[in-house]
A protein has these predicted regions:
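Iron-sulfur cluster-binding electron-transfer modules in prokaryotic oxidoreductases
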Residues: 1-167
Length: 167
């Protein structure tokens, strides 16, 4: 009790990276350790999926790149500016997609999610490629007392049997 049970395989259709949102990266903390705002979302994502890859280290954490939609720019009339603002992040996303086959990018910030859903197609990505951290957890969570839990327990038992047979 008190722990979430996650089935990472529920997100196997995604190869994921994470966008450090400006406001979270520069103006907040998470947890009780320095840098928690960078490490906690990544730990949650790694616990929720089997295929996680960081973007270029120079473009994440304290060095994160803007989504291009913050600061009051999130309006369709300013789409040209928003697209130019998103270009550096889209370049970093393209690189991790080319190297690791990344198909989705998670973000915490609702502004970033709204921005990316509009600009991703302009850079050759599906607009559905932006997801949230809580969406990844929601996909993977195994609810207690559900048929999903029964399936999970069955899988876990089969995996344990297979591991025992290999020893």
């Amino acid at each position: 009790a008190g722990k979430l049970r996650l089935d990472k395989s529920k997100n196997d259709h995604m190869r994921l990276t994470f966008h450090d949102s400006c406001n979270v990266a520069r103006a907040s903390r998470m947890g009780n350790m320095p840098g928690g705002q960078f490490e906690i979302p990544r730990a949650i994502l790694r616990a929720s999926c089997n295929h996680y890859f960081d973007m270029d280290p120079e473009t994440i954490r304290e060095g994160t790149l803007c989504c291009g939609g913050g600061g009051g720019l999130l309006t369709d009339e300013l789409m040209d500016i928003r697209t130019k603002g998103a270009a550096p992040r889209m370049k970093a996303l393209r690189e991790v997609a080319d190297v690791h086959g990344v198909t989705h990018m998670a973000a915490i910030c609702a502004i970033c999610k709204a921005q990316f859903s509009k600009v991703l197609p302009k850079f050759g990505f599906d607009m559905e490629a932006i997801v949230s951290v809580h969406q990844m957890v929601s996909n993977a969570i195994v609810l207690t007392g559900s048929t999903q839990e029964e399936e999970w327990n069955k899988k876990a038992g089969l995996a344990a049997q297979a591991a025992g047979a290999q020893v």
